[in-house]
C-alpha cells in the first residue's frame, strides 16, 4: 500500500502510468486472497488511506472504529474523480483476481464469505452514493463503473456456485436501468449503450440476479414507447437491444408462452415479431433474425414439452385450451413466414459475397426451426410451403412471370423447397400423414422438375437446382407409397440426367439416387432395366467421379439384393461383375505400358473398380436375419441351394477380380486402398448366416491371406491381413479345424519373426496382437494346441508391455484378459492355461513386466495395465500376491540402484489390491499407487 501511495505522488506515473498502478492493485488483490482472514477489507483501507492522505493497512485490527457510515461520504466529497475512479478500478481488479484464483477447498468457502460480507458491501455503498449523488451523470465515472460491475457479476456467480453466499444485485441493477431510461433519445453519450452491453453480459452470466421487479422494469422499457423510439431513432444498437430482449425473456419462457392467448400481451408478441423481421439481409445487414432463431426454438420447446402446465394454467377449460392452441399456431405461422422470406437467396448473389458460410448456417438453423415448428402447426405449414411452389410453377407454366422477375420467383420456389426438405427428413412411410403424401404427389406431378432441368441447361441457378435434387431425396419415404411408386421412374430419370449431363450436380445426384435406392430397394425391382445403360456408362467411362461410380453401383446392387428370385438376382450380378472383370482386366494389362501422365488417372479408376466390388458386397448384405427376409422356409431353402451351387460362377468372378488386383499387378498389389477394399469384400460375407454371393469358405479366405503374405514386397498392408484373419476366426471358428488354423498361425508367426518384417512397427504389432486377441476370445484352443508357438506368443506379448503406443497397449489388454479369463475355452483349454501359470514362470514374468511398465507409462494408459492386473488377481488370487510382492521388491531394488525414486508403500498396495479380488475398486488403488510412485498429485480429487 505504501508503494502504491508513492506512485500516486509521482506525477509521471499518475499521468501516464495506469498500467503500473493496475499491476500494483493486482498484487494487493492477490495478497488479500492469501491473507483474507487477517486483512479483511482492503477497499476500506484504500478509502481511509485517501481520507488521511497516507497509506493505511489495518492488518488484524479491522474493528477499530476508524471506518464508519460517514467515511464513504467524506471520501467522495474530498477525492478527485480520478481517485474515485481508481477505487472502482481496484474493486474491479479485486473481483477479477478472485474469480481467477484457485484456492484450496477448505479456504474457498471462508474466502467467499469474507468477500460477500466485506468487499461487496463496500463496493455497493460507494457505487450507490456516486450514482445517486453529484457524479451520477459523469460519463467517465460510468465508463469505469460498468466494467467493475460486470467483474462483480462474474465473481458473484462463481461464488454462489462454490459457497452458500447469495448476492443481491438489485440496487446496482436498478441504478443502471434508471440511468439508461432517463437518457434522452437520441443519446448524446455512449453510457446507455454500454449499460445495455453490461445488462446483456449480466443476463448471460447469471439471470437469477434479475429479480421480478427488475425484469418488469426492463420489460416496461423494452415493450413500451422507449423501446420503439430507440429502435426507430438509433437502429445501430438494434443487435444488442435484441440480445437484451431475448435473454430477458428466456429467463421465463414458460411464463411468456402462457401469455400467448392473453389479449393484453398481444403487443408484446407483435413487438417480438417486428424485431425478428428486422429490415435487412440476414447475417450481412442484420443479425437479429439469426439471434431470434434460438429464442423461437425455446418457445417451441416450451409449447411442446410443458402442455400439462398450460392446461393447469388454463384450468383445464377446453375452450381456453383451444384458443391457446389456435393462437400458438398463428404466432408460429407468422414466425415461419418471416423466416421463409429471410432465407431467400438474394437475386443478386453478390449481396452475400464473403458471408456465404454464415448465410448457409443461418438457413440451416432456420430449417431446424421449421422442423421444430411442424409438430405444433402440423400440415398447414407443409401445405403452405408446397402451395408456394405449385403457385410459382403454375405462373411459369402459363407465362405469367414478368420479364426480369424469373430469378426472384425461382428463389421463392427454392426457399419453399429448402424448408420442405427440413420438415420431410423426419417422415417415414409409416408416419407420414396422408395430406402430406398428397402434397408431395402434387409437387412431383407439377412441372417443377422440368423447370429445374430447363434452368440447369442455362448453366446458372445452382441453389435452386441443388435444393430441388435434395428435395426428391428428402421424400424417399414417399416412393414406398402407392402414389409414390408411380413417380419413381420419372424421379430416377431426372436424377440420372442431372448426374450424367452436368458435372456440377454429379455428386449430389448420385447421393440422392443412393438414398432412394437404399430406402426403396423392394419398390425398385421393375426399374432395374433402367439402370443398365447408366451402370455400363459408370464402369466404362474412366472420367466419371469415383464416388459417383461407387454410389451408383452400390445403389444398383442394393436393388438387386431385393430381388426374390435367386436366379434373376444371379443373372443381374453376373452381368455386373462380368463388366467389372472385363474392364479391370483390360486396364490392369495396359497399366505398365501407360505414359506417366495417364498412369495416375488409370490407377484411380482401377481403385474405384475394386471399390465398386466392395460396394456390391455391402449392397448385397441381407438387411435382416435370413428368416425375417425369407419368411417362407421353402424360399429360404431355395435361395441357400442356389448360392451353394452358384451355377453362374459368381464366386469365381469375385475371386478372379481379387486375384488380379492382389497378385496380378506390380503397381497395385501392395496398394493400401486396394488392400482395404479387398478386406471389405471378404468381410461383407463374414457376418451372413446363409450362403450368398459374397459368402466364401473360411479356408479359402485363409489361403488367400497366407498366399498374399508370401508375395508381399512391402508390409504396409500386413496389418489388414492380420485383421482379416482375426475376423475370419471370430466369425467362423466353429466351422474351422483347429489343425488348419494352427498351421496358418504358425505360417503367420514365422513370417512375422523373419527379418523381412519390421517387428518394431507399431501398426504391425498392434494388428498381430489384435488377431491373437480375437483367437483367444473366440476359440482359444486354436492358439493353445501348439505349445511351442504359444510359448513364443506369450513371451512376445509380455515384452510388448513396455510399448509406448496406446493402441498396442489396448490390444495387449484384450489379449491378456481374454487369455486369463478364457470365457470361450473348454475344460482342456482351462487346464492348459492354468498349468502355464502354475508350473512355469509365466505368472511372475507377466507380473514383473506389467508392474514395471505400469510405473513408467503415461497416466492415460494406466487403465490398460489395471485391467490385466485385475484379471490375474481375480483368476489366480493365491499366486498373484506372491508374484506382486516379488516383482515390486525387484523393481524397487532396481530403481534405487539406478538412482530413481523408491516405490513407496508397495506392501500396503499389494494388500489393498488383493482385497479387491479383481473388482473395479482396484482402479483407484492402481491410479493412486502410480501417482504416489511418480511424485504426482491427483488435483481432481483435491478439488
Q: What label would you give each PLM region?
A:
Residues 1-943:
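Karyopherin-beta/Importin-beta family HEAT-repeat alpha-solenoid scaffold
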Amino acid at each position: 500500500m505504501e508503494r502504491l501511495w508513492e506512485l500516486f505522488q509521482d506525477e509521471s506515473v499518475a499521468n501516464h502510468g495506469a498500467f503500473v498502478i493496475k499491476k500494483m492493485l493486482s498484487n494487493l488483490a492477490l495478497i488479500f486472497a492469501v491473507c483474507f482472514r487477517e486483512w479483511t477489507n482492503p477497499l476500506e483501507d484504500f478509502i481511509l488511506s485517501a481520507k488521511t492522505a497516507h497509506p493505511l493497512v489495518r492488518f488484524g485490527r479491522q474493528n477499530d472504529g476508524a471506518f464508519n457510515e460517514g467515511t464513504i461520504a467524506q471520501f467522495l466529497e474530498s477525492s478527485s474523480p480520478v481517485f474515485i475512479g481508481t477505487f472502482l478500478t481496484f474493486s474491479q481488479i479485486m473481483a477479477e483476481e478472485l474469480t481467477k484464483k484457485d484456492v484450496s477447498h477448505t479456504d474457498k468457502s471462508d474466502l467467499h464469505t469474507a468477500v460477500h460480507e466485506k468487499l461487496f458491501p463496500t463496493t455497493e455503498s460507494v457505487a450507490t452514493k456516486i450514482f445517486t449523488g453529484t457524479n451520477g451523470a459523469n460519463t467517465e465515472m460510468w465508463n469505469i463503473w460498468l466494467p467493475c460491475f460486470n467483474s462483480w457479476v462474474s465473481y458473484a456467480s462463481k461464488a454462489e456456485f462454490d459457497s452458500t453466499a447469495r448476492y443481491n444485485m438489485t440496487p446496482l441493477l436498478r441504478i443502471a436501468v434508471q440511468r439508461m431510461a432517463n437518457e434522452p433519445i437520441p443519446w448524446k453519450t455512449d453510457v446507455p449503450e454500454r449499460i445495455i452491453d453490461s445488462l446483456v453480459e449480466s443476463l448471460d452470466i447469471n439471470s437469477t440476479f434479475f429479480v421480478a421487479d427488475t425484469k418488469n422494469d426492463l420489460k416496461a422499457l423494452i415493450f413500451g414507447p422507449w423501446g420503439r423510439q430507440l429502435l426507430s431513432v438509433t437502429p445501430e444498437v438494434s443487435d444488442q437491444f435484441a440480445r437484451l430482449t431475448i435473454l430477458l425473456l428466456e429467463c421465463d419462457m414458460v411464463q411468456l408462452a402462457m401469455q400467448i392467448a392473453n389479449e393484453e400481451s398481444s403487443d408484446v408478441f407483435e413487438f417480438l415479431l417486428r424485431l425478428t423481421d428486422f429490415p435487412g439481409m440476414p447475417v450481412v445487414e442484420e443479425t437479429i433474425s439469426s439471434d431470434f432463431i434460438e429464442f423461437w426454438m425455446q418457445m417451441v420447446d416450451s409449447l411442446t414439452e410443458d402442455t400439462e402446465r398450460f392446461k393447469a394454467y388454463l384450468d383445464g377449460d377446453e375452450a381456453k385450451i383451444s384458443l391457446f392452441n389456435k393462437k400458438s399456431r398463428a404466432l408460429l405461422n407468422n414466425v415461419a413466414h418471416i423466416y421463409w422470406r429471410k432465407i431467400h437467396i438474394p437475386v443478386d448473389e453478390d449481396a452475400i459475397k464473403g458471408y456465404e458460410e454464415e448465410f448457409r448456417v443461418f438457413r440451416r438453423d432456420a430449417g431446424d426451426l421449421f422442423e421444430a415448428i411442424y409438430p405444433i402447426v402440423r400440415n398447414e405449414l407443409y401445405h403452405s410451403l408446397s402451395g408456394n411452389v405449385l403457385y410459382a410453377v403454375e405462373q411459369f407454366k402459363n407465362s405469367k412471370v414478368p420479364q426480369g422477375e424469373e430469378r426472384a420467383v425461382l428463389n421463392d420456389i427454392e426457399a419453399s423447397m429448402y424448408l420442405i426438405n427440413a420438415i420431410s427428413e423426419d417422415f417415414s412411410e409409416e408416419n407420414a400423414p396422408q395430406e402430406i403424401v398428397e402434397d408431395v404427389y402434387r409437387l412431383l406431378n407439377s412441372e417443377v422438375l422440368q423447370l429445374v432441368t430447363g434452368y440447369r441447361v442455362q448453366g446458372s441457378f445452382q441453389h435452386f437446382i441443388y435444393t430441388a435434387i435434395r428435395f426428391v431425396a428428402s421424400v424417399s419415404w414417399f416412393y414406398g407409397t402407392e402414389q409414390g411408386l408411380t413417380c419413381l421412374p420419372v424421379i430416377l430419370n431426372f436424377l440420372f440426367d442431372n448426374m450424367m449431363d452436368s458435372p456440377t450436380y454429379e455428386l449430389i445426384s448420385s447421393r440422392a439416387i443412393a438414398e432412394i435406392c437404399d430406402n426403396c430397394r423392394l419398390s425398385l425391382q421393375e426399374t432395374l432395366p433402367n439402370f443398365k445403360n447408366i451402370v455400363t456408362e459408370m464402369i466404362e467411362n474412366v472420367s466419371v467421379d469415383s464416388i459417383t461410380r461407387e454410389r451408383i453401383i452400390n445403389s444398383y446392387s442394393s436393388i438387386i439384393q431385393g430381388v426374390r428370385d435367386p436366379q434373376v438376382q444371379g443373372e443381374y450380378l453376373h452381368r455386373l461383375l462380368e463388366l467389372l472383370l472385363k474392364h479391370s482386366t483390360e486396364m490392369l494389362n495396359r497399366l505398365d505400358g501407360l505414359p506417366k501422365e495417364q498412369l495416375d488417372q488409370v490407377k484411380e479408376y482401377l481403385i474405384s473398380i475394386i471399390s465398386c466390388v466392395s460396394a456390391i458386397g455391402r449392397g448385397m448384405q441381407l438387411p435382416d436375419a435370413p428368416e425375417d427376409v425369407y419368411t417362407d422356409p421353402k424360399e429360404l431353402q431355395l435361395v441357400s441351394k442356389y448360392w451353394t451351387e452358384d451355377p453362374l460362377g459368381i464366386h469365381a468372378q469375385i475371386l478372379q477380380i481379387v486375384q488380379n488386383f492382389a497378385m496380378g499387378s506390380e503397381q497395385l498389389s501392395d496398394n493400401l486402398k486396394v488392400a482395404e477394399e479387398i478386406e471389405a469384400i471378404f468381410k461383407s460375407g463374414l457376418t451372413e448366416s446363409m450362403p450368398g454371393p459374397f459368402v466364401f469358405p473360411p479356408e479359402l479366405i485363409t489361403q488367400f491371406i497366407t498366399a498374399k503374405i508370401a508375395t508381399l514386397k512391402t508390409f504396409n498392408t500386413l496389418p489388414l491381413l492380420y485383421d482379416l484373419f482375426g475376423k475370419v476366426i471370430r466369425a467362423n471358428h466353429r466351422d474351422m479345424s483347429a489343425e488348419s488354423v494352427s498351421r496358418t498361425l504358425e505360417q503367420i508367426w514365422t513370417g512375422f519373426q523373419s527379418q523381412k518384417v519390421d517387428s518394431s512397427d507399431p501398426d504391425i504389432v498392434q494388428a498381430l496382437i489384435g488377431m491373437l486377441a480375437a483367437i483367444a476370445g473366440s476359440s482359444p484352443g486354436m492358439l493353445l494346441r501348439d505349445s511351442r508357438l504359444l510359448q513364443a506368443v506369450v513371451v512376445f506379448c509380455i515384452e510388448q508391455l513396455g510399448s509406448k503406443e496406446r493402441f498396442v497397449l489396448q490390444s495387449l489388454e484384450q489379449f491378456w484378459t481374454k487369455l486369463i479369463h478364457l470365457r470361450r475355452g473348454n475344460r482342456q483349454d482351462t487346464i492348459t492355461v492354468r498349468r502355464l501359470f502354475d508350473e512355469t514362470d509365466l505368472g511372475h514374468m507377466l507380473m514383473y513386466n506389467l508392474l514395471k511398465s505400469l510405473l513408467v507409462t503415461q497416466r492415460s494408459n494406466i487403465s490398460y495395465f489395471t485391467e490385466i492386473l485385475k484379471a490375474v488377481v481375480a483368476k489366480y488370487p493365491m499366486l498373484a500376491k506372491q508374484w506382486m510382492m516379488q516383482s515390486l521388491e525387484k523393481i524397487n531394488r532396481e530403481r534405487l540402484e539406478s538412482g530413481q525414486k523408491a516405490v513407496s508403500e508397495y506392501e500396503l498396495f499389494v494388500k489393498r489390491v488383493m482385497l479387491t479380488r479383481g473388482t473395479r475398486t482396484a482402479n483407484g488403488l492402481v491410479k493412486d499407487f502410480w501417482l504416489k510412485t511418480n511424485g504426482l498429485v491427483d488435483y481432481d480429487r483435491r478439488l
